[in-house]
Amino acid sequence: MNMFSSCMITALVILTLPIIMSSTKLYKNKLYPYYVKTATSYAFMISMIPTMMFIYSGQETIISNWHWMTIQTMKLSMSFKLDYFSMIFVPVALFVTWSIMEFSMWYMHSDPYINRFFKYLLLFLITMMVLVTANNMFQLFIGWEGVGIMSFLLIGWWYGRTDANTAALQAVLYNRIGDVGFIMTMAWFLLNLNTWDLQQIFITTNDNFNLPLLGLLLAATGKSAQFGLHPWLPSAMEGPTPVSALLHSSTMVVAGVFLLIRFHPLMEHNQTIQTLTLCLGAITTLFTAICALTQNDIKKIVAFSTSSQLGLMMVTIGINQPYLAFLHICTHAFFKAMLFMCSGSIIHSLNDEQDIRKMGGLFKVLPFTTTSLIIGSLALTGMPFLTGFYSKDLIIESANTSNTNAWALLITLVATSLTAAYSTRIMFFALLGQPRFSPMILINENNPLLINSIKRLLIGSVFAGYIISHSITPTTIPQMTMPHYLKMTALAVTILGFILALELNLTTQGLKFNYPSNYFKFSSLLGYYPTIMHRLTPKTSLTISQKSASMLLDSIWLENILPKSISYFQMKSSTLISNQKGLIKLYFLSFMLTMILSLLILNYHG
């Protein structure tokens, strides 16, 4: 096992070499991106050695080399947990990052700060590796916050654009809400169990884990863009396409789901948390799939599909299948990163045009990119024998055979069908039909950096699902009987989605313009969530604050207490002291009546 742990640590150390290099003159060299890409590829190849050893032997390792500090009775040490989840995820993340970095060398070649961009990507990858291999909550929190801050820096890379700055701040603010849950969980474990070590937490027999698990669920909701904290993910598409491909499809956004997988031993017997996870994931996967149907920005459609797949992973955890959720994380990384890279290739070729209504006919001028996009879309929908099929089909089968509420299962099936619909929509608008872009644009995809990076992920999108699914324990699957209609459910709803999209396409051809319906507005305006949360809520808050400030400060203190109070007291005192009101006629009449009455009384007595 020494070789096992040594190879893994070597792979992690290799990644830090370009960071150390940034303090030397080599950092200013034009070849620095090449050094970073090469270091990532070597780290991937070395990490495959312990992964293959683990698959063969099935023994996990915990490395605790460096004791950091002791707080009263609690010890904090640097500890790495090399188990199934970390051993499979590390090579997948390194392979995807290797391809994305090669793609970035083509996509960002004209950026004057490309060296800093690659350093940020590498720092993000290192913090993600720290998160995945952490064996205690403190180390996990370092990786958790690391991916958060690197996400902020990379989303706001083009800081001259207002939208990019707003999107970066939005991502940080939504993730801070999730971080509150993470810190609350850490505090609870510290107060009640006096440990942050994962093994010690798991062996504790405490039935009252609702509060820390709710904190973990809140943390996962923020980081994995679940319903309620979801708007930051589509907004993050303002960053460069390589950032979207790496952070917001295959690594950072799955950190929340990975956190719940890590703490699944605490969740598996807690029905309350599992039900919440199931319902939250089901709502997310349906809502974001509906939103994706009417979007026109190609990157935002892919972003909403990411959020929908994250909801599907949460559903899988909710039905007590963490290994299937992890399998979907790994398979999803290949085709989703490739979809973003194909989108980036199209956007770059069309002079930064992202509207699918202004594309069309690209299969003639970008044959390799469009072929990869179609295969990636088919893998996303779960087409048989592509990578997505091996995880998505198993998830739908597990949901069909589990004793959960049929409501969550039904809306998950609807979302699966809608996935096929919006994937078909991208193909129709962007790839097929007549070109709708300027004929003056020179389109060229003959660049080895672009072709090789997409080609590697294309191979992964076809074969990776078969390879990874056969390494999940137990490797020998027991025989299981299932009715044909249940077995074919996933494929049936996918085909239904394709048919629905084709029918809608045929129906809408040649129609006159009509004002959009309320359903269309609900989908295109993202369920009015950004309008309510980002416009109405701040406006209402500012209006109430302004009114209360002006009424309390100006009207009450500055007017009533000082100037108005003086005049009020003067008028009140003058009213009390002087009863003279200036009514001369009334006074004269009163005087005459009094005189006449007095004379009459005197005459009467006389």
Curated annotation (Swiss-Prot):
The chain crosses the membrane at residues 1-21, 43-63, 87-107, 117-137, 140-160, 171-191, 241-261, 273-293, 310-330, 365-385, 409-429, 457-477, 488-508, 582-602. Its main location: mitochondrion. GO terms for cellular component: mitochondrial inner membrane. Disulfide bonds: none annotated. One of its GO terms (biological process) is mitochondrial electron transport, NADH to ubiquinone. Keywords: Electron transport, Membrane, Mitochondrion, Mitochondrion inner membrane, NAD, Respiratory chain, Translocase, Transmembrane, Transmembrane helix, Transport, Ubiquinone. It comes from the Eukaryota. Pfam families: NADH5_C, Proton_antipo_M, Proton_antipo_N. GO terms for molecular function: NADH dehydrogenase (ubiquinone) activity. It is a multi-pass membrane protein. It catalyses: a ubiquinone + NADH + 5 H(+)(in) = a ubiquinol + NAD(+) + 4 H(+)(out). Its EC number is 7.1.1.2. It is found in: Mitochondrion inner membrane. The keyword Amino-acid biosynthesis does not apply. The keyword Mitochondrion applies. Core subunit of respiratory chain NADH dehydrogenase (Complex I) which is composed of 45 different subunits. NCBIfam families: NDH_I_L (TIGR01974). Belongs to the complex I subunit 5 family. Core subunit of the mitochondrial membrane respiratory chain NADH dehydrogenase (Complex I) which catalyzes electron transfer from NADH through the respiratory chain, using ubiquinone as an electron acceptor. Essential for the catalytic activity and assembly of complex I. This is NADH-ubiquinone oxidoreductase chain 5. It comes from Canis lupus.
